Amino acid sequence: IYICFMNHKEIDSKLNQGLQLPIMESFYTIQGEGFYKGSAAFFIRIAGCDVGCHWCDVKESWDSDLHPICSIDQIVENAKKYSNMVVITGGEPLMWNMNPLTRLLKQHNIRVHIETSGSNKLTGYWDWICLSPKKRKNPINEIYSKADELKIIIFNKHDLKYAEEQAKKVSKKCILYLQPEWEKRDEMMPIIVEYVMKNSKWKISLQTHKYQNIP
């Protein structure tokens, strides 16, 4: 439980500076998706999202006002108890200034990853950037060249065309993933498998933590 004695003006100032952040939850678990699947990591889910996908599985993260404000010192003190790898996710973490938090994490020799839609300016010091673009609000151009992996959620077959459009914008080193939307996985997986077999630059990303009932 975090108790704050500052007034709203002071809180807003620290939020704008990235010295405090709205945190929906944080937890130590196994990364279930993408290149680092199977790796232990401490997840920090930052509240607030300006994209709002209808199939989002953490819609409760969208409204930052519903979640406690935490200082980055508190966040890092908690994270360093668990792992030398932190994954910052949301919501959409780039709605906030990520420079102070990521700088402090790296001062403690913690590897820092982000999962983002890329809808806002890229801030922060990152060891790995997972870019997961959304049709509702496309990434800003500057982030494409920085992405280490591109993850496209496939809700219907038309998303494959969107995936190809997005793949043209990232660098050659970027790893390309197609991931079925969880509720549509049985319907979409055969389509994705066939597509990847015909277009081998793509890999399949599965939410393995859900298959294995890992939180």
Q: Where are the regions a protein language model picked out?
A:
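S-adenosyl-L-methionine
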Residues: 34-37
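Conserved Radical SAM active-site core
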Residues: 8-11, 16-28, 40-43, 47-126
